[in-house]
């Protein structure tokens, strides 16, 4: 009998699904990836067909399991997923009653604005660490219950189940035996109290969501059950689950207070470990649970950028400026600067610290001398500028005391971007050998549950730096560029947008 010496990680993202098998040394032994369709039925609406997701989960998992020699080598399975995206399904059939509403979906902006006008945001923020924004799951659940025929009655009768993508996949993998989620996914719904660490009755009432819909909430490393034997040839223990950005905290080994990571995928999400006590931001950053292992909870401050890699995808699929994402590196390096061109990629509004769902994208500073390369470079630069805004907000909150940022995700492989980011932040940027840190974090959580790794110290020992980028830009030039960025952002903000203390009204020279 083969030794169970590997962990299978399922990484279900916004635009693709990946399965990766890791060995005990945290090296990837097999990888399979599938992109799936996005659905945009109306302006600002974004949906996923969960059958597409389920099909790709099975296909990629089976391919990687076969590549390493079969299920007998898999000690456990871990799941990480796009957060906030919500699905409601029939408990009897396991079929969704509607396409999943994706985290990028803005259809409930009006409902969130009404609650804000009623003075409800302070209560929501105190309990959840989140803002009243359609980004989060609660208003999406309410929309589904109110717009799918008979859904609310069926939900109250206990006929339906709701959950983020991890919860739906767990239900399918276990053949409907487990309706559970982990604490990091739960805390992104706007229904979960991060202090009591329970579903909150006042929040359930505010959003009109029946408690019967919601899953059990577990530690990130837990016994989540087993897969059905028919799926992969034998049963596989499911030992870990985490939302993608929290899984990346684990994969980047940011286990100590003050450590920070930024993941550049479809969006960019920066999490700063704040230790065992939550810190409430004065700059409209989010307070969230980083992870809970063995009943011990660590918190984080989070800044969310809605468009990072999605902007590169838009350059490829929308503008047809490139045919592959890697071309942006070459385009950026062959010109000395962006020639005064700025792009604000507010395609689905702006995230932290502005939280303006109604702002829209902007390209400014165009002249007859502007080229495709200037636009591509401006897109890359915009992600670094937005990261600067997040770090500045964290520093003003008194939480950011380190001068090192660990990066991962698809954009992290772009050397030009990593160097520009370091210069903008005036901080060292560390890139690990393994940039698949989201999947790796899910693998670590599952491996900790079954004993493949014995402790977080053992996990930390596997983290290896591939390269460190140090600031190189002239300080005066840096200030000019950041001031230009903030001028561009001002043009996109709607008059009603809430203003963070760390707003664009503060010049870069004052904040740098």
UniProtKB/Swiss-Prot annotation:
Pathway: Polyol metabolism; glycerol degradation via glycerol kinase pathway; sn-glycerol 3-phosphate from glycerol: step 1/1. Its EC number is 2.7.1.30. Inhibited by fructose 1,6-bisphosphate (FBP). Keywords: ATP-binding, Glycerol metabolism, Kinase, Nucleotide-binding, Transferase. One of its GO terms (cellular component) is cytosol. GO terms for biological process: glycerol catabolic process; glycerol metabolic process; glycerol-3-phosphate metabolic process. The gene is glpK. ATP binds at residues 14-16, 266, 309, 410. SUPFAM superfamilies: Actin-like ATPase domain. It is an enzyme of class 2 (transferase). CDD domains: FGGY_EcGK_like. Glycerol binds at residues 83-84, 135, 244-245. The keyword Kinase applies. ADP binds at residues 14, 18, 266, 309, 410, 414. PROSITE patterns: FGGY_KINASES_1 (PS00933), FGGY_KINASES_2 (PS00445). Belongs to the FGGY kinase family. Sn-glycerol 3-phosphate binds at residues 14, 83-84, 135, 244. It comes from Gluconobacter oxydans (strain 621H). One of its GO terms (molecular function) is ATP binding. InterPro entries: ATPase_NBD, Carb_kinase_FGGY, Carb_kinase_FGGY_CS, FGGY_C, FGGY_N, Glycerol_kin. Key enzyme in the regulation of glycerol uptake and metabolism. Catalyzes the phosphorylation of glycerol to yield sn-glycerol 3-phosphate. It catalyses: glycerol + ATP = sn-glycerol 3-phosphate + ADP + H(+). It comes from the Bacteria. This is Glycerol kinase.
């Amino acid at each position: 009998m083969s030794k169970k010496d590997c962990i299978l990680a399922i990484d279900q993202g916004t635009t693709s699904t990946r399965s990766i098998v890791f060995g005990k040394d945290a090296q990837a032994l097999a990888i399979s990836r599938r992109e799936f369709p996005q659905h945009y039925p109306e302006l600002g609406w974004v949906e996923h067909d969960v059958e597409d997701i389920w099909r790709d989960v099975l296909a990629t998992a089976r391919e990687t399991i076969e590549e390493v020699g079969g299920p007998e080598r898999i000690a456990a399975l871990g799941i990480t997923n796009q957060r906030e995206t919500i699905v409601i399904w029939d408990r009897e059939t396991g079929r969704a009653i509607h396409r999943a509403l994706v985290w990028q979906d803005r259809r409930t902006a009006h409902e969130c604005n009404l609650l804000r006008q009623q003075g409800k945001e302070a209560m929501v923020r105190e309990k959840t660490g989140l803002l009243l924004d359609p980004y989060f799951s609660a208003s999406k659940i309410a929309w589904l219950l109110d717009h799918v025929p008979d859904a609310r009655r069926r939900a109250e009768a206990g006929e339906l189940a709701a959950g983020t993508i991890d919860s739906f996949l767990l239900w399918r993998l276990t053949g409907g035996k487990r309706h559970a989620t982990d604490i990091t996914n739960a805390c992104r719904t706007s229904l979960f109290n991060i202090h009591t660490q329970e579903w909150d009755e006042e929040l359930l009432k505010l959003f009109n969501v029946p408690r019967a819909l919601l899953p059990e909430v577990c530690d990130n490393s837990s016994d989540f059950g087993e897969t059905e034997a028919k799926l992969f040839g034998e049963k596989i223990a499911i030992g870990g689950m985490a939302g993608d950005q929290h899984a990346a905290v684990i994969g980047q080994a940011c286990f100590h207070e003050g450590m920070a990571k930024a993941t550049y995928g479809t969006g960019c999400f920066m999490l700063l470990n704040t230790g065992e006590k939550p810190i409430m931001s004065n700059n409209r950053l989010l307070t969230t649970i980083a992870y809970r292992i063995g009943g011990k909870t660590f918190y984080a401050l989070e800044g969310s950028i809605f468009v990072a890699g999605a902007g590169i995808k838009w350059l490829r699929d929308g503008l047809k400026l490139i045919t592959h994402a890697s071309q942006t590196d070459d385009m950026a390096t062959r010109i000395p600067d962006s020639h005064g061109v700025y792009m604000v990629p507010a395609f689905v509004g702006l995230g932290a610290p502005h939280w303006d769902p109604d702002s829209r994208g902007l390209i400014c500073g165009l002249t007859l001398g502007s080229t495709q390369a200037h636009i591509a470079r401006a897109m890359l630069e915009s992600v670094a500028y937005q990261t600067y805004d997040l770090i500045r907000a964290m520093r003003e909150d008194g939480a950011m005391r380190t001068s090192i940022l660990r990066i991962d995700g698809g954009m992290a492989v772009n050397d030009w971007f990593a160097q520009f980011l370091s210069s903008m932040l005036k901080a060292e940027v560390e890139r690990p050998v393994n940039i698949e840190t989201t999947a790796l974090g899910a693998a670590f959580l599952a491996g900790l549950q079954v004993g493949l790794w014995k402790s977080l110290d053992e996990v930390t020992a596997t983290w290896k730096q591939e390269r460190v980028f140090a600031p190189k830009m002239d300080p005066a030039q840096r200030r000019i560029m950041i001031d230009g960025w903030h001028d561009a952002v001002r043009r996109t903000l709607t008059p009603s947008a809430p203003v963070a203390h760390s707003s664009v009204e503060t010049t870069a020279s004052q904040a740098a």
